Amino acid sequence: MGIRKYKPTTPGRRGSSVADFAEITRSTPEKSLLRPLHKTGGRNNSGKITTRHKGGGHKRQYRLIDFRRHDKDGINARVAEIEYDPNRTARIALLHYVDGTKRYIIAPNKLSQGDFVEAGPDADIKPGNNLPLRNIPVGTVIHAVELRPGGGAKMARSAGASVQLVAKEGRFAQLRLPSGEIRNVDVRCRATVGEVGNAEQSNINWGKAGRMRWKGVRPTVRGVAMNPVDHPHGGGEGKTSGGRHPVNPNGKPEGRTRRPNKESDKLIVRRRRTGKNKR
């Protein structure tokens, strides 16, 4: 993937850039793998906003991605197409299995049209192949990692993401995550070899707010710029600091939203580096 920069023909174009989509081989998706996708606008079932800054955006169809691949062990598949997916930053690969089945997977780096991939404990260690962690050598870079055996890939699925297998001990494998955290994962869990493609995605300059609106992202407005009816930090004569510790529109303290006693925390070997006291 490359990035194409626009010339500054308008203020919105100045400094903006776009992916060149050079790796894309097909413009229309596989119809049998499409499903309707209904937007929520950030609202729950009672119509209340539960996630701010969401709404609008271009209409999309969901592409069914095979995050398990358990039922295709030992069956070769040819990479028929590399496609764009509007629902994720990574590209997706359309696989044609020798038994006639068609599936989508996350497209890893260095996977090209015409390549062959395989799943199962006896698969080779090459990009796109899916194996249990117990069958992957220490030091291998992987992505699309399961957290529970058979639960489907949960970690390292976005563009450029990868996890490194750093050790295996007993029934656990130790993985180094992009955040620096080292976590134990059951060796029966599966992962795909290689890192996710489209790594240049993070270098795209969107250029103008309108491009984010096309993606369904609405503006982020500071509470101190609002009226008292809209936010606890609103109001005041002239510019104010808000007058209290940062809170959300419902008055609940901002920050520190993660549970300190989550059940899976016992699998963390070394925590990620956070805040000012990184070490």
Swiss-Prot record:
Keywords: Ribonucleoprotein, Ribosomal protein, RNA-binding, rRNA-binding. GO terms for molecular function: rRNA binding; structural constituent of ribosome; transferase activity. Residues 50-59, 269-279 have a biased composition (Basic residues). Residues 253-268 have a biased composition (Basic and acidic residues). GO terms for cellular component: large ribosomal subunit. Residues 29-59, 224-279 are annotated as: Disordered. PROSITE patterns: RIBOSOMAL_L2. InterPro entries: NA-bd_OB-fold (IPR012340), Rib_uL2_dom2 (IPR014722), Ribosomal_uL2 (IPR002171), Ribosomal_uL2_bac/org-type (IPR005880), Ribosomal_uL2_C (IPR022669), Ribosomal_uL2_CS (IPR022671), Ribosomal_uL2_dom3 (IPR014726), Ribosomal_uL2_RNA-bd_dom (IPR022666). SMART domains: Ribosomal_L2, Ribosomal_L2_C. Pfam families: Ribosomal_L2, Ribosomal_L2_C. One of its GO terms (biological process) is cytoplasmic translation. One of the primary rRNA binding proteins. Required for association of the 30S and 50S subunits to form the 70S ribosome, for tRNA binding and peptide bond formation. It has been suggested to have peptidyltransferase activity; this is somewhat controversial. Makes several contacts with the 16S rRNA in the 70S ribosome. Part of the 50S ribosomal subunit. Forms a bridge to the 30S subunit in the 70S ribosome. Belongs to the universal ribosomal protein uL2 family. This is Large ribosomal subunit protein uL2. It comes from Paenarthrobacter aurescens (strain TC1). The gene is rplB.
